[in-house]
Amino acid sequence: MKRKFKRAILYARQHRANQEVNESLHRLVDFLSTQDIEIFQDSDTAASFELKAPVLPREKMGAKHDLIIVVGGDGSLLSASRMAIKVNAPVIGINRGRLGFLTDILPQDIESHLGPVLNGQYNEEERFLLHTKIYDKENSYFEGDALNDVVLGRGSETHLIEFDVYINQQLVSHYRSDGMILSTPTGSTAYALSAGGPIMHPQLNAIVLVPMFSHSLSSRPLVIDGEAEIELYISKSNETDLRISCDGHESRVVKPGQKVAVKKNGNRLRLLHPLDYHYYDTLRSKLGWESKHQG
């Protein structure tokens, strides 16, 4: 059995401030109050929800054996992940979203599933993030991290954009398309999947590049080594600014002639699951795959 947690930090995004999330947060506070654990909340959570728990500044998180409990959907966990990797604190999710690939625990199972986790009965896996940078010869303009994907999009353009893709300083191809999705295995069941990308097991050390509506019949998703360094050279022929987004949260302008570098972040997200969690069960359930049990 692993070490018990000493502190629980509750996290919910402001725009998810609805009755369902509020109910689960208060249910968590009531349950955690019966456990031998200190209860805190993140400052963003405190701004939108009235919980009987003190705010723990982010710079003080991770100082003890902390667990970050996210209430919301996968988007909420994506947001919390960028905070969690900076303090090396593990994360577990209560699903109040739609699909819930990352948020395992159902609201009605909070007590039965979270109790054993608090006492050290859980599975832990590491998920890597992508780090991206927008730059040119003179300056660096933006840096961000993504657990799911980094997306180059056409912004306000209504026609195809042009860019070159280099991997480890070697030219791969010139693209004319709506953009490019660069996804981790974690993100392979998100935006990349809807664009025709493959599903990758989350423990694979790989990155997938998925062109979006490419003007070429031979353009296909490309799975590469997770240690590779990727560069997108934005063609000067583009008539307007493009955009780069990280997990759909952070979005920045990319100008013609600039470059976008993408590589693995040195930190890992520590994602926890109840002991009865199985990845392929999640795929089958969330994607509606059929199952046939032999009698």
Swiss-Prot record:
The keyword Nucleotide-binding applies. Pfam families: NAD_kinase, NAD_kinase_C. GO terms for cellular component: cytoplasm. Keywords: ATP-binding, Cytoplasm, Kinase, NAD, NADP, Nucleotide-binding, Transferase. Its cofactor is a divalent metal cation. Its EC number is 2.7.1.23. Coiled coil: none annotated. It is an enzyme of class 2 (transferase). GO terms for biological process: NAD metabolic process; NADP biosynthetic process. The active site is at D74. InterPro entries: ATP-NAD_kinase_N, ATP-NAD_kinase_PpnK-typ_C, NAD/diacylglycerol_kinase_sf, NADK. Disulfide bonds: none annotated. NAD(+) binds at D74, G75, N148, D149, H159, R176, D178, T189, A190, Y191, A192, L193, S194. GO terms for molecular function: ATP binding; metal ion binding; NAD binding; NAD+ kinase activity. Signal peptide: none annotated. It is found in: Cytoplasm. Its main location: cytoplasm. It catalyses: NAD(+) + ATP = ADP + NADP(+) + H(+). Involved in the regulation of the intracellular balance of NAD and NADP, and is a key enzyme in the biosynthesis of NADP. Catalyzes specifically the phosphorylation on 2'-hydroxyl of the adenosine moiety of NAD to yield NADP. NCBIfam families: PRK01231.1. Belongs to the NAD kinase family. This is NAD kinase.
